UniProtKB/Swiss-Prot annotation:
This is Proteasome activator complex subunit 1. Residues 59-102 are annotated as: Disordered. Heterodimer of PSME1 and PSME2, which forms a hexameric ring. PSME1 can form homoheptamers. It comes from Mus musculus (Mouse). One of its GO terms (biological process) is antigen processing and presentation of exogenous antigen. Implicated in immunoproteasome assembly and required for efficient antigen processing. The PA28 activator complex enhances the generation of class I binding peptides by altering the cleavage pattern of the proteasome. Signal peptide: none annotated.
Amino acid sequence: MATLRVHPEAQAKVDVFREDLCSKTENLLGSYFPKKISELDAFLKEPALNEANLSNLKAPLDIPVPDPVKEKEKEERKKQQEKEEKEEKKKGDEDDKGPPCGPVNCNEKIVVLLQRLKPEIKDVTEQLNLVTTWLQLQIPRIEDGNNFGVAVQEKVFELMTNLHTKLEGFHTQISKYFSERGDAVAKAAKQPHVGDYRQLVHELDEAEYQEIRLMVMEIRNAYAVLYDIILKNFEKLKKPRGETKGMIY
């Protein structure tokens, strides 16, 4: 039978790491998870996440609508100037030209909520990673028979994988919001007479507000579901075959 020789000192370090990680994880499950469930549930009940009238989220969009007469005169002068310039230089000027207004700020209400949400995403992702590692360290040596406990471990691990995938999407969603809002603001600045672009900015803010509430809810639910399923199956997860056997890793 092939065996892997491991120095006692190295094995001792691995054992210390394993014991420390298991202790941290069980402390998380016993006290930290219930605390986070309560905190996030309270966050969901705050007025900041329960705005009934979404029009109150509207942020100032300081993009003036130019006077049509002045714009027409300006356009005529521009056309005359373009005739006298080379095509490449004209294109360069167009690329370098800024919007016909000052800086347009982010929606402060949305930014404030995101500043509270992003640390929660980071936290739950790290805790989920820790619990996943703990579960993997409970997997026994692969053997025939008496694998019901191992099947329970696999089901819980599958749940954790799905939660991790969902949490990864939160960062993408936040970045996508700012990208799409920036594009909408740029279009509104470039074509200030088109009201649809202005309205698009407000629609994106309202949609992001609802997404933020859903993300907080999903994080709370992730803590609650993990806490519940691990608590109900703790014995099977900890000792899938009724006794502690060698780690698979």
